[in-house]
């Protein structure tokens, strides 16, 4: 295990890498920020000294190295042709497509998604939460910047494929971390489908996704539910189980929970672009994800053993105000949608 000082240093380094990518105006600085992120999370992933953790760390390093190498080569070619390192799409469609694929690989989108479930299953919930949320911010920032000049179909087709792969892949899983990995793949499909049309809404949906996913990971960490069968055996933390029910339904995008904001905004944006058939296919794919969310809810609540006495229930639990706040935001933010849109579209 890592000492608290080293762990805090690594977490601050993670934040530094993302901020470097956010504030960079050149490809070389953006690439350095991505590399700082990768180097900082590797010790966090391997801290348990378990063979599965080491295997997951190795797979993650190989996948990220391939994406970073491709991104650096395409950035060098762009600088060679344009004469500067400024973050701008390349005029060569082959270079632009390779750059987009490299960022999709780092995001874990289909068809470059194979590393994500295998890596996620070897991590603990907190490190998995960082991988599924914070590590997505820097690549999606770069993807949004080049998506405006990219061929729309080159982004929309992987986005649609991610929704179907995320839903289909999670159907036969029993590991909760693998289910959340496929959930992340499906959500990345919805988020990136808006990147060519509306960067502001793309950022809003990304932050909402990070909020709900973080709350779900923390809740499963509290319940120690590594497998979905463990959800039926938890007798003493029924409040967390009830909160998990709401969080899973919010991840599925059911109204009036917070997760419905992402589906609603994406549907409105795609409909405005006259992509009705594409939107219908995205909705059909999201039903697959909703099925395994509902199955987890069924196991968590319906199949839980009855408690005939209140002595088994920990009513006097330690106050956890941050967890309470993040859970409330993850489930009750839908009524604030007009205000969120007003804030994010403010120029």
Curated annotation (Swiss-Prot):
BP GO terms, sorted: mitochondrial electron transport, NADH to ubiquinone
Q: Which InterPro entries match?
A: Complex_I_Subunit_2 (IPR050175), NADH_UbQ_OxRdtase_chain2 (IPR003917), ND/Mrp_TM (IPR001750)
Give a yes or no for keyword Signal in this entry.
no
Location of the protein in the cell = Mitochondrion inner membrane
Identify its membrane topology class: Multi-pass membrane protein
EC code(s) of this entry: 7.1.1.2
From the UniProt record, list the coiled-coil ranges: none
Segments crossing the lipid bilayer: 2-22, 26-46, 60-80, 93-113, 114-134, 151-171, 179-199, 203-223, 242-262, 274-294, 297-319, 324-344
Please provide, in alphabetical order, the Gene Ontology terms of the cellular component aspect for this entry. mitochondrial inner membrane
Catalytic activity, reaction form = a ubiquinone + NADH + 5 H(+)(in) = a ubiquinol + NAD(+) + 4 H(+)(out)
Keywords, sorted A to Z? Electron transport, Membrane, Mitochondrion, Mitochondrion inner membrane, NAD, Respiratory chain, Translocase, Transmembrane, Transmembrane helix, Transport, Ubiquinone
The UniProt record lists the keyword Nuclease: no
Enzyme class, first EC level, given as a word:
translocase
Q: Name one GO molecular function term.
A: NADH dehydrogenase (ubiquinone) activity
Q: What's this protein's family per the entry?
A: Belongs to the complex I subunit 2 family.
Provide the function of this protein: Core subunit of the mitochondrial membrane respiratory chain NADH dehydrogenase (Complex I) that is believed to belong to the minimal assembly required for catalysis. Complex I functions in the transfer of electrons from NADH to the respiratory chain. The immediate electron acceptor for the enzyme is believed to be ubiquinone.
Know the name of this protein?
NADH-ubiquinone oxidoreductase chain 2
Organism expressing this protein natively: Petromyzon marinus (Sea lamprey)
